[in-house]
Amino acid sequence: MVLNKVTYKINAYKIKEEFIPKEVHFYRIKSFVNEAFNFYRFVNFYGGMIINKKDKSFVLPYKVDNKVLKYKDGNNEIPIDIEYIKSLKLEYVKPEIAEKLVRGYLKSVHKIEPELSRIIKNIRKHKVVENIKVESYCEYEVKKHDGDYYLILNFRHTASITKHLWDFVNRDKALLEEYVGKKIIFKPNPKVRYTISLVDAPNPQKIEEIMSHIIKYYKWSEDMVKSTFGEIDYNQPIMYCEEILEPFAPQFCNLVFYMDELDSYILKELQSYWRLSNENKGKIINEIAKKLRFIDNTPKELEFMKFNNTPLLVKDVNKNPTKIYSTNTLFTWIYNQNAKIYLPYDVPEIIRNKNLLTYILIDEEIKDELKAIKDKVNKMFRNYNKIANKTELPKFNYANRWKYFSTDDIRGIIKEIKSEFNDEICFALIIGKEKYKDNDYYEILKKQLFDLKIISQNILWENWRKDDKGYMTNNLLIQIMGKLGIKYFILDSKTPYDYIMGLDTGLGIFGNHRVGGCTVVYDSEGKIRRIQPIETPAPGERLHLPYVIEYLENKANIDMENKNILFLRDGFIQNSERNDLKEISKELNSNIEVISIRKNNKYKVFTSDYRIGSVFGNDGIFLPHKTPFGSNPVKLSTWLRFNCGNEEGLKINESIMQLLYDLTKMNYSALYGEGRYLRIPAPIHYADKFVKALGKNWKIDEELLKHGFLYFI
């Protein structure tokens, strides 16, 4: 495979030698600690890493002269006796451990975080719209690349109420208690969100300690504290949060929220502040870097591979395979009689040549538009059904099934449909008036319809009525096809894997057991084979990959023997899983590979280009798509192979990145032109969507999932 190469700058800056430790030092906790002692939190506070949980050994990026370290446990400061084990030159430490120790060195010894906080506040002023404030905060990590250590530097945004929390609740403790369970930020460090768990009695001494911490650690002056928070109220209650033991004072905190909770006008105004092109974001990051003393201020230039725009396969009217390079013209024949007709590559047997009972559900607030709505629906379904009659596609039988519904009376329309329902797979097209505040404006209606085995798709009339060129109609049809399990296209060439599986974990209810996650199984053609919920052995238990493999083979009857299998997952392989995976690969005589794909990461590429990928250190930087306001790359952090009882770490390369790019095209829920495919490969994208649907209490229909129906999208 030959890929073109391009060069772009990324947000990586070489760390100066004087800010990198020469040696690291190993210690062990000597004294007894109680069961409440949080070993991870203790080591992380001092910028180190755990080596062995059992014998309480850890490593620090600096030498400790005093053999007693302090551990804060609520109100108490506990002395922890430690003993020295050995020292080791940093160059002899594994890169993934060394990176974290260099980060800990910058954090604990050189106090990089308060310095970044001061710099970003000077460079990027906050924005206020009505009572909502958006401000920027920095984040960072350390990566080793070609023998040098680099600081990966980025900034994000957080939105909060302008008033501090104590004023927001009108200095009323009872009202503050109503916000237990809500998210807050600690004003001097807005990048971390905390969840209020307890509102306690006032404690002036703790208020003084919090103030002292702000002044000493974050380098705020007393005048800055007063100008930001006003006169300090020493009689305010103390709060505790789920994430850490330290107390909080509401006067130093702000209530935060999610973007979908905002009024649309406020959201639009704030988006103009935080939606930046990659080039503009790069300029701001460079400004921050120039003021940071730990690094060279020139960003790293990196060579990227430009992925090939490989074709997809559909079928022509003679059912012969034909190539396409984008999917946005698949249904042009609905509106243009001269357009080429494309047929799907695979139709599930359970709906093949079926007449689907179809309901047209119209929001009663747009009943005056009935004539125009009927024209749109008739044109789409009549033209579609003409073609479907000559193929294996299902037909939509919607005659005399036009109904009005009210969003205030979902029960009424469900009751009406239920009275004439025949217990077969049906379809409903929901035509709505407007987008309501909840994420999916007709989610309740769609879920209740699906309880009756009616798969549905919604569209806003306000948008559809303006669709003169048929783009929205085309998109609507592919969404309907995907929900009905129709695989309209496949990859042009087979992959080297028998199965490519996307794995995501989460919470949901399945039967009488807790569902721990979902695996979406694609075959070698890039086609969805099935969607499989995974039950956990016990409620709340984390899913381990070896258990998932056994579950797929034993409970889901997927043949895993003598196969070449690729797992894509959003998360790391735990050490405890590795030995089991080696054993399973030996028992099954199968090659099992796992790639960790991280959507949330700190990398930024200073370009609007897309369809590109590179390797930095041991990370893959993967940027398959574009957006109008700056695309975030995906990080490929680990690629492991388990074969015949052996484990091998693989290096991210051109071939695997090209395959992952090809899989971003396998989007059965939207039509896009080149460059507007999925951000992550389809198997893990749909696994994530299914887990989110479980969290919203969508019903699980195993029969439909076996055929790859995306009814939950």
Curated annotation (Swiss-Prot):
Induction: Constitutively expressed (at protein level). It is an enzyme of class 3 (hydrolase). Residues 18-129 are annotated as: N-terminal domain. GO terms for biological process: clearance of foreign intracellular DNA; defense response to virus. InterPro entries: Ago_N_arc, Ago_PAZ_methanocaldococcus, PAZ_dom, PAZ_dom_sf, Piwi, RNaseH-like_sf, RNaseH_sf. Residues 346-488 are annotated as: Mid domain. Changing E246A: Nearly complete loss of guide-independent plasmid cleavage. Loss of guide-dependent cleavage of tDNA. A divalent metal cation binds at Q457, Q479, K483. Has 4 structurally distinct domains; N-terminal, PAZ (binds the 3'-end of gDNA), Mid (binds the phosphorylated 5'-end of gDNA) and PIWI (binds near the 5'-end of gDNA) arranged in a bilobal manner. Upon binding of gDNA the PAZ and Mid domains separate, opening a channel probably for tDNA-binding; a smaller channel also opens between the N-terminal and PIWI domains. Belongs to the argonaute family. Long pAgo subfamily. This is Protein argonaute.
